[in-house]
Amino acid sequence: MLVLLLGASAFAVDLGWIFLNGSRLQRAADSASLAGVVNLPVSPSGALVDAVDAAGRNGFPIVANGATTLTPSILADNRYKVDMTTTIDTFFLKALGFSDFEIFKTSTAEYIKPVRLGSPDHTFGVPGSNFWAAINGQFTEKQQGDPYATRCLTTTFDTGGARCDTSNEGPDGEFRDWGYFYVIEVAEGSSNLKVEIYEPSQAVNDDGSPSSDTSEQLWRWDWTERFVTTTFKLLQPDETPFAPFDNVEQCSESFPRISTSQEWETLCSDPVSVPGSLDAGMWLLNIPSPPYEGTSMFGIQASVDGGPAPKVYGLFDMSIFVNIDGDEATPFLAEIRPEHEGKTFELDIFDMGDNEINTEAWIEILYPNGDVVDCSWTSNNVGNESAPTGPCRIDITNQRFNDAWLKMEIDLDNYMCDITQPLGCWWKIKIHNEGQAHDRTTWTARITGNPLRLVP
């Protein structure tokens, strides 16, 4: 009887030891997968280096002929799996012939990407899509629809060089000289990347009226420094695609103002922008804040030889010119995917509703199936208006949000969409405007919460 009790006690001690080390190994595997996934899709080797480092820092060094092994698997461009096996010595079970015990644990981590904005395909703001990509010159007044590319809350009416009216309200605190970024997402097996810009130059004529389908404008025709010179910088993929400020520049090209233009221009070289085979990754197109005054609208499209068509979309935010055919447009807003379930979708729109006074105008935020979502909203407009959660149809009549932010919050609890369909998770925004059929505006969208998570 005593022998049985001693055997049971020995087994209990070793079982607890095995359980403790299993828990430790699981924590190490979780840390390794989370550390590795942030390197995808650009650097699988970097993912392995970081995963091995995380495992070691959690008590399981990965060395040649060591007790612990780590095997990585790339399940998707944002999913990283780690299998870890370790061997531990036993205590009392040695007497029963079990000198060591092997433990196996696995962990899969997912990096939740920033939401894709504005386009589900290889184009952004092209003819016939109801909107254009856009950017305003640095010395354009903020109320003209671009809070980030413009320095000025107001400008002077004097002739001479472009400048802000610092005697009134001062410079725009939201200004950023780097402007906007667009992603050109290239898949494995692609080659010969071609990036084209539709009407890259500001095209306006000297009587102040639009001279192209993009309806480009100036507001200070008497300035000696006027018009917009737009620059496009194509940046190479790197290991941190969502931290775009350290990417290596592939090429850059500037386009000064011209009188008329309605053509596609291949960026940087012809016939392709980047010749040869391409690794999977995210090329970036940067449009920095240009001199001097006015607005420039343009379209973007990308193509490759071999492999699927690239994806082109706004990163973090998009500054656009909505060009409505009739009194209603329903452009794509953002791709909200199943992994965003349980989080909050925050949508900020600046200067929405450049409509004629006393004409009906409203917007609706739509699920992929066309149903209106529920949202709450606040604004820094006159009156600092707000509304509790309810159907997200917001009246924008009489320029209600002129020169102001409209900030919406949308709860994604129990959210589902069909990711197997090309447009199955793409939300839209319906813009109804019975008066003036265009709007210069800027949209910012994000998913709140930790972008890293463990998945089964």
Name what the model sees in each region:
Residues 1-13, 27:
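Alpha-helical hydrophobic helix detector
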Residues 104-456:
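N-linked glycosylation sequons
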Residues 78-116:
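Small-polar (Ser/Thr/Gly)-enriched, low-hydrophobicity segments
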Residues 16-23, 31-91:
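Short amphipathic secondary-structure patches
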Residues 25-26, 104:
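Short, charged, low-complexity patches
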Residues 28, 47, 99:
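Short acidic-hydrophobic sequence patches enriched in Asp/Glu that either
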